[in-house]
Amino acid sequence: MAAKLIAFDEEARSKLLTGVLKLSKAVKATLGPKGRYVVLERKFGSPLITNDGVTIAKEIDLEDPYENLGAQLAKEVASKTNDVAGDGTTTATVLAEAMVREGMKNVTAGANPIALRRGIEKAVEAVTEEIKKLSRPVSGKRDITEVATISAKDQQIGSIIAEAMEKVGKDGVVTVEEGKSLGMELEFVEGMQFDRGYVSPYFVTDPERMETVLEDPLIVITDKKISNVQEFLPLLEKIVQYGRSFLLIADDVEGEALATLVVNKLRGTFNCVAVKAPGFGDRRKEMLQDIAIVTGGQVISEELGVSFESVTPDMFGHARSVKVDKESTTIVGGKGSSEEIEKRIAQIRKQLETTESEYEKEKLQERLAKLAGGVAVIKVGAATETEMKEKKHRVEDAVSATKAAMEEGIVAGGGVTLVKASTVLDKLPLENDELIGATIVKKALMEPARVIAENAGFAGEVVVEELKKREYPVGFDAVKGEYVDMFEAGIIDPTKVTRSALQNAASIAAMVLTTEALVVEKPEQEKAQPGMPPEEY
């Protein structure tokens, strides 16, 4: 077993702080409308140019093992915020850095880290409530356009996303693909998405994005648990005869059957992906039936008197394409009869009218959206591959931000909401080190607005002081260098993004401040090559 290195107390915390600061410095340069870009080296292919916080953070690994732990914790802030809200990763990193930096000063000066942590947690709770009060719901296409435009820093992207959202609605699905042309195109396709991903990562066809994409696949739908390969073989042989890729949706796929699929996929015998059926109990049966109707297939079920041996070709579903990642499956362009789909929609609407349960209504509404909503596909094109990847990143972030805005509403952007929400901390009944914890949060809340101004070439401290005097929602437009009503100017952020950034930053900051020891593996010294033996003459 490799030997370990241990650092304690002040040394441990200062190393963590250095790691957080290094990562943050690279990430925060991208914040705001005048934020810079960061170029990331790729081992293969062209370098990636991006201003997406989480993408930059994921690329950073530091040489010093202690500092690297700090960088990894800061990376976690960006990653968690991206998972929850899909955007706001740079803001989250900036907040975390400010809290850790201010907190370290106080811990070094003798403050109790546990009391500081309590103060930080109470302060964040109060500010989160204040952010919710300052929030307002999204009203109409203009708000959606503005949220997407701010996230992507591009008016055209904002307009296209707003159009896509308008077509599919709040419950619809928007996917982003690489396009063939130089510009951006919006395609609206009847499709369906459910929250079940692949049962094994070996099915992945795109390792960079960790997803499986199948073009024109067969779709096999069954409510059986498949583990015995002998039972499954007759069905597999029928599928392989077609020489096409296939999606297998089953109650579960495990054991020999899963191994058989994986091995044949890796050998290139056929291309496939297996996913678990969505839902539970009776709802699972209904959802499988929905998928069958959308794809023009039939559920293979013992209850319907259909076994794997008796399957006929017309029982397979068909679709234009299928995209599966770790958490969801999207079926695009299902070849089901529109008449049958309309009948199914009418049936669900009837059930909606008669059901009493709120939970049941919500689930029926979800199924309705999946059947009627469809999928909007945004195709992103550019002159070079590097530019296209960067643009695609921005579009994906903007789609996530827009969905977040539709969920929890919007607040004024440019960091002004955090500055305004900080005033609630003056009324918190805290004392001693807990009060210092709240003060740490208050100082950190000024940081995003300051960094946005400085990245645009203005004096950050002056801008923050001016924002404190102004009435919400007046903020600083970093493009024009003016103080404006942020809602009227269209500078808005999703409430969910702002809230998640703050909560995740505080969580990591509190963890760093209460750290007392670091344990890392001792780097192995590379042994020198042995010398050549003397030549004999």
UniProtKB/Swiss-Prot annotation:
The keyword Acetylation does not apply. PROSITE patterns: CHAPERONINS_CPN60 (PS00296). Together with its co-chaperonin GroES, plays an essential role in assisting protein folding. The GroEL-GroES system forms a nano-cage that allows encapsulation of the non-native substrate proteins and provides a physical environment optimized to promote and accelerate protein folding. GO terms for molecular function: ATP binding; ATP-dependent protein folding chaperone; isomerase activity; unfolded protein binding. Its EC number is 5.6.1.7. This is Chaperonin GroEL. It comes from the Bacteria. Keywords: ATP-binding, Chaperone, Cytoplasm, Isomerase, Nucleotide-binding. Coiled coil: none annotated. Pfam families: Cpn60_TCP1 (PF00118). InterPro entries: Chaperonin_Cpn60_CS, Cpn60/GroEL, Cpn60/GroEL/TCP-1, GroEL-like_apical_dom_sf, GROEL-like_equatorial_sf, TCP-1-like_intermed_sf. It is found in: Cytoplasm. Belongs to the chaperonin (HSP60) family. ATP binds at residues 30-33, 87-91, 414, 477-479, 493. The keyword Phosphoprotein does not apply. One of its GO terms (biological process) is protein refolding. It catalyses: ATP + H2O + a folded polypeptide = ADP + phosphate + an unfolded polypeptide. Gene3D superfamilies: GroEL, GroEL-like equatorial domain, TCP-1-like chaperonin intermediate domain. Forms a cylinder of 14 subunits composed of two heptameric rings stacked back-to-back. Interacts with the co-chaperonin GroES. One of its GO terms (cellular component) is cytoplasm.
